[in-house]
């Protein structure tokens, strides 16, 4: 960070511009700032993840005195059926070139929700209900195992997730999510 301040000073000398704003990093730099070891000239940090999601970006632990439940991605169940956890017949690559593996858990209550990979990567969503399991997604739909849901579900039930920062970015910029 000291080098960044030196570069600002060199640019000031070379251009005559004030350059009062020095952006020194993002949420990962908060521990440095909080410890008092960040140069005082660093006067701007981009700390959206720490403020909005309440997470320390170095290890994803909760940031002190913040909440981790401030943002939810909400989708709706559009199809709900009991299905075997293992598909019948041969399987191959999905539409995204991935070979999906399946675990035999018997017959499960499977929901199709109106949110898909065009909106968010399913790995960037954590179900609020620990009984929900994200199984995967197509372009348009998210597939969720609802068998161990804390509450009864039906078509039209809202399903809630906590996003990662990448998930928040994707859903916030998707024209299909509002």
Segments (PLM) and residue ranges:
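Hydrophobic core residues within well-ordered beta-strands of beta-rich domains
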Residues: 71-73, 109
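C-terminal accessory subdomain/extension
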Residues: 84-178
